[in-house]
């Protein structure tokens, strides 16, 4: 009731531990934090606000997943799994909701605090916003950003090649 005029919900929070299950410092607590932050919390937030969104015109939910939801990398299996969960949840939610538009942003590596010291070829947050804004205005609900467009094509042509590309990514 406090947010009765809310018409857009953006789920952008995320954490990623760049570790494998074999790393002794990758604890059950870290795993639970990753799942809670990346998957459970957005679902709970949507559930708690769905009636408000349904009652307002031009309502939208924007979930941010990751290119790693499409093709995972060797490290960060739990992160990849949570983002794949957001990907499928967004698609399913789109089927359920007629009055609320459900968008999914599927970005590559973005230059943020979370990715500091990781990877090359990051895109700026502004580039992500610009690409998403175009998609939002055109009601394109599954928004592959920058390199993810190419990753999708490669994965469709040969998932083995996509897997090899991602397996080589260590950051």
Go through the PLM ranges and name each one:
Residues 104-105, 116-156:
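C-terminal helical subdomain
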Residues 71, 92-101:
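Active-site-adjacent segment of SDR/Rossmann-fold oxidoreductases
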Residues 16-32, 75:
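Conserved mid-core segment of classical short-chain dehydrogenase/reductases
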Residues 9-10:
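Conserved hydrophobic beta-strands of the Rossmann-like cofactor-binding core
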Residues 2-3, 48-57:
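A short helix-coil junction within the Rossmann-fold of NAD(P)-dependent oxidoreductases
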Residues 46, 82:
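Active-site helix of classical SDR
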Residues 66:
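Residue(s) in the substrate-gating loop at a strand-loop-helix junction
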